[in-house]
Amino acid sequence: LSPEAEESYLVTASDSWSGWWGSDWIRSDDALSGYDRGGTSDTLMSLSGLPDFKTESTEEVGLPPLLLEKWASEGRLEQEQNELDAFFEENKLPKTVLNYEIKWLTDWVAEYGIDGFRCDTAKHIDQKCWAELKKYASLALEEWRKANPGKTDFETPFWTVGEAWDHGVVKDTYFETGMFDAMINFSFRKNLLKGYSILPKLYTFMSDTMRKEDISVLSYISSHDTAL
């Protein structure tokens, strides 16, 4: 959209944006009133113009205005605050943006027994943050299994797969720092364009590399980001 067309439905200069997430929580390239602009690095930019949570911040924050209003109107503000306080106290964590998000995401694991996350555009979050999310998601899955004996017949650990554009069959910091169990393999589709005759050699390379490096990849032949 042109700036003129965007402004026709998004009034960026309004002071009402202070009642949304607030500048302690997010940055935005839409020049929203009172909000910081995105940076230039992968982890600080506003991807595709979307608001970006400040997961790198070490500052403690209170609940954002929109959640305070929403939960108060639903009559569950005290309950939500108590659950958050219990999570932070039990795990001895500061009330940072990252740790709030870890709490909310792992609630899905603790409540429904979700046993893995597929993490989109992983390069836009510091890899240490992904490792922290996996740590607490793993604990939440253990909690769910203890509370729901017999509901599953497998005890595999919580699993994460990351998507980082153009990642191939290689061991790097996504595995070692981000603690991903697998990364999406963009190279498979590219190699396949050379013809099906390459498959035996390609499979051998992938198998040998994954075995040697003790890694796993998730390969695909087509996606909404690419073409076959």
Show which residues each predicted segment covers:
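Active-site rim elements
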Residues: F88-P94, R118-T121, A227-L228
